């Protein structure tokens, strides 16, 4: 029973990793070297009070609609099962875990960035780092954990396994990107 639960957690982590990786690949194609939709023709909501809440990031039309789409995709299971706090907690916690993976994989596989640049350079849209990683990653993990803690605490042990597996998969992907890196691109998108 314990091994079956562990395998289920590994499968869940793998699914969230693949979903995050695919979203990262899509965003690399859309944004190129310019994260946070910097060069995209999209609206931006950025009053000073909002920028204080978001660590200096405007809300872009691109991100608003993409995240709204993902919100509905993640809630699709509610078409088949009755709403419950436990199901909603799982949906929200899973979204936050996948979101950290999605963003990190954008840096890992983006030819204009890569893991070395991610760890060593300042990222304009992530001005605060803690132990080499944007503070938002820790917030995502915290929101994921706290959602389960508040709505379905019996799932916390499962969450720990899924989160640990996701961290491992992200580390393996970062290592793999160093073994077979893509061609690095400069700021203007041309090879360095």
Q: Where are the language model's segments positioned?
A:
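Aromatic-rich, lipid-facing transmembrane alpha helices and their immediate juxtamembrane interface loops
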Residues: 1-192
């Amino acid at each position: 029973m314990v091994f079956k639960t562990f395998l289920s957690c590994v499968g869940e982590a793998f699914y969230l990793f693949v979903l995050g990786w695919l979203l990262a690949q899509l965003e690399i194609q859309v944004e190129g070297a310019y994260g946070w939709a910097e060069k995209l023709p999209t609206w931006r909501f950025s009053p000073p009070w909002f920028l204080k809440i978001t660590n200096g990031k405007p809300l872009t039309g691109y991100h608003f609609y993409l995240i709204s789409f993902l919100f509905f995709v993640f809630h699709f299971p509610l078409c088949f099962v009755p709403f419950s706090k436990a199901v909603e907690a799982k949906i929200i916690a899973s979204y936050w875990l996948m979101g950290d993976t999605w963003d990190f994989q954008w840096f890992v596989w983006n030819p204009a960035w890569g893991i070395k640049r991610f760890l060593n350079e300042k990222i304009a849209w992530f001005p605060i780092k803690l132990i080499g990683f944007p503070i938002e990653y820790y917030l995502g993990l915290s929101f994921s954990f706290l959602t389960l803690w508040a709505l379905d605490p019996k799932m916390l042990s499962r969450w720990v396994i899924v989160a640990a597996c996701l961290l491992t998969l992200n580390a393996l992907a970062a290592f793999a990107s160093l073994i077979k890196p893509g061609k690095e691109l400069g700021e203007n998108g041309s090879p360095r």
